């Protein structure tokens, strides 16, 4: 049966900050499929938001032009390094469902692991690359998986991973949390919400950093006609 792609993004700001340094965007690929871009700018507040929006805009523009994900990551890094002279960093993720190659590709310059859930198993894949912007020859880490029904991928920024640290708790083991809820049959949106709610709870309802969770799932469908749906909810201060 054909596949259906579900993407859910849940995010919130650092406590008492009106602007989030995290930016997440979804873009349709010219060859078919979707890409999700997540940028976590250094720091928080207006400066971090300006940085993350600038980098995500550049990435989205290149993806729409058909540039390959790895080249996009390098170009965004080169731009940041050239203009900020290695003094400003950002975490940068692209996760794509590429219909040309029938694969899911994660291209990452990040500090947090990626959670992969397939065939009933949940695995936490540590990143092998650091953030962009600091060193001239920084390269992304690339993970490629077959695009098949039942695959679920969870990405999150470092605010999720460190949730609870300032309250004296250990870091948030997202992989273990996913294992604990995997029998509940959660949708992408429900899983993203559950992870975000748990991170906020661990921070005593006062997030110590910007928090972003992205969940991408692949499932089978028998829809006719094919209807694409997209919705966004943004509560205003």
Language model: regions and residue ranges:
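Active-site-proximal, acidic helix/loop segment immediately C-terminal to a metal-coordinating Asp/Glu
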Residues: 44-65, 152-203, 222, 228-231, ...
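Primarily the active-site beta-strand->alpha-helix module of PP2C/PPM metal-dependent phosphatases
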Residues: 22-79, 167-171
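Small-residue (GG/TT-enriched) beta-loop-alpha framework at ligand/catalytic clefts
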Residues: 122-123, 129-130, 134, 174-177, ...
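Regulatory cytosolic signal-relay segments
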Residues: 1-20
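DG-centered beta-turn motif at the end of beta-strands
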Residues: 40-41, 111, 156-160, 210
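Generic detection of short hydrophobic beta-strand segments and adjacent strand-loop junctions
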Residues: 123-125, 143-145, 226-237
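Acidic loop->beta-strand submotif enriched in PP2C/PPM serine/threonine phosphatases
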Residues: 17-34, 90-92, 125-170
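Catalytic core of PPM/PP2C metal-dependent serine/threonine phosphatase domains
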Residues: 49-119, 126, 138-140, 192-216
């Amino acid at each position: 049966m054909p596949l259906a792609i579900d993407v859910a993004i849940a995010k919130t700001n650092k406590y008492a900050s009106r602007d989030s340094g995290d930016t997440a965007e979804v873009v349709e690929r010219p060859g078919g499929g979707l890409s999700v871009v997540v940028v976590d700018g250094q720091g928080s507040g207006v400066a971090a938001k300006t940085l993350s929006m600038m980098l995500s805009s550049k990435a989205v523009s290149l993806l729409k032009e058909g540039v390959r994900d790895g080249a996009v990551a390098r170009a965004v890094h080169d731009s940041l390094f050239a203009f900020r002279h290695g003094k400003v960093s950002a975490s940068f993720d692209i996760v794509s469902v590429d219909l040309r190659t029938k694969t899911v590709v994660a291209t990452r310059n990040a500090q947090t692991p990626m959670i992969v859930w397939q065939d009933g198993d949940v695995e936490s894949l540590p990143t092998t690359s650091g953030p962009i912007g600091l060193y001239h020859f920084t390269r992304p880490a690339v993970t490629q998986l077959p695009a098949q029904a039942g695959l679920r991928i969870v990405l999150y920024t470092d605010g999720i991973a460190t949730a609870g640290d300032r309250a004296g708790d250990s870091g948030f083991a997202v992989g273990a949390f996913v294992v604990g809820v995997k029998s509940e049959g959660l949708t992408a949106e429900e899983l993203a919400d559950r992870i975000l709610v748990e991170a906020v709870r661990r921070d005593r309802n006062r997030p110590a950093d910007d928090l972003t969770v992205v969940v991408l799932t692949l499932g089978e469908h028998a829809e006719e006609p094919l209807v694409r749906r997209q919705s966004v909810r943004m509560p205003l201060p």
